Amino acid sequence: MTPRHFLRDDDLSPAEQAEVLALAAELKKDPFSARPLEGPRGVAVLFDKNSTRTRFSFEVGIAQLGGHAVVVDARSTQLGRDETLEDTARVLSRYVEAIVWRTFEQHRLEAMAGAATVPVINALSDEFHPCQVLADLQAIAEHKGSLSGLRMCYLGDGANNMAHSLMLGGVTAGIHVTIAAPDGFTPAPEFVAAARRRAESTGATVTLTTDARTAARGVDVLVTDTWTSMGQEDDGLDRRTPFWPYQLNADLVSLADPEAIVLHCLPAHRGEEITDEVMDGPSSVVWDEAENRLHAQKALLTWLLERQA
C-alpha cells in the first residue's frame, strides 16, 4: 500500500483535515484512547534543526500512543555523510512505522517520502510548518467554534514557513487568510497560488497586503512569528526596521474584533514581533496552542497509521 505523507498542509483535503482535528479534540480529552503504536513500535524522529516543542511533543505523544520514539540528530547519521536520502528512507522503512523529520529544504523531505514505504511527516521545513498549523487550528476551534468563515490575519515575515502553512491550512479549513508583510517579505507566489486553488473549494480567500492596520481591522484571529527564522541569523538582512509596523501590540489588537484571539507558534522574541502585554494578555491563546502540538500530532500519526494498516 502506498503510504500517506504529511509534507505540506494541503496534503490533507478539507474533510481529512476535519477528521484529524476531531480526533485531536478526542485525544485531548482522553490522551490514551488511541494506541496504534502498541508494542511498542518505533517512530524515527530526525532533527537537522534545534527544537523544544517539536521534540517534546512528538516524544511524549509517541509514548502515549504506545510507541517508542527513536530521536536522532540527522547530522550524526549517514545522511550527514554520503548516503542518499532514498537509501536512508528505504532502510528506515524496514525498522519503523513512520518517519518524522525537522529539516531545512522541503525537497529533501519530498525525496525521503518518495522512497519511504511508511508515512513521512514534516516536523518543520524552511517552506512549511504543517504540524504547527494543525495545533493552531485546534486552538482556534476551541476558542471560536466553527472554523469556516473566520477571518485570520498573519503579521510579519510573509515569506516564512508559518505564513505559507497558515495560508494553505487556513483556507483548507475555510478561513479567510490575510498576510500583512512588508515588501520583499511576501509569500512565495507558487504557495499563494496553491492556497487560492484550495480556497476555491472551501469558500475561503487569500489576501496579501503591506498595510498592517487595515489587515488587522475586525479579524477574529491575529497571528505572528519571529522575524528571524532559524538559519537566517547571518543572512545580512535588516529584519527589524521593516517589521516594526507589524509588531503585534495592544494598538493592533484593539483594531481586531473585541473577541479576537492571538497566536504565536513560539519561541517568541518578546518586545520584537509581539509585546509582553499581548503575549500575556487576555486575548492570547499561545499556551493552548503550544499544548495542542501534542494532541494534533498524535491525531495525525494515528490517522496516517490507520491508512497504512
From Swiss-Prot:
One GO term (biological process): citrulline biosynthetic process
Residues where carbamoyl phosphate binds: 51-54, 78, 102, 129-132, 265-266, 293
Name the record gives this protein: Ornithine carbamoyltransferase
Assigned EC number: 2.1.3.3
Keywords: Amino-acid biosynthesis, Arginine biosynthesis, Cytoplasm, Transferase
Function: Reversibly catalyzes the transfer of the carbamoyl group from carbamoyl phosphate (CP) to the N(epsilon) atom of ornithine (ORN) to produce L-citrulline.
Pathways per UniProt: Amino-acid biosynthesis; L-arginine biosynthesis; L-arginine from L-ornithine and carbamoyl phosphate: step 1/3
GO annotations of cellular component type: cytoplasm
GO terms, molecular function: amino acid binding; ornithine carbamoyltransferase activity
Recorded catalytic activity of this chain's protein: carbamoyl phosphate + L-ornithine = L-citrulline + phosphate + H(+)
Subcellular location: Cytoplasm
Stored Pfam families: OTCace, OTCace_N
Top-level taxon of the source organism: Bacteria
Stated family: Belongs to the aspartate/ornithine carbamoyltransferase superfamily. OTCase family.
Annotated binding of L-ornithine, by residue: 161, 225, 229-230
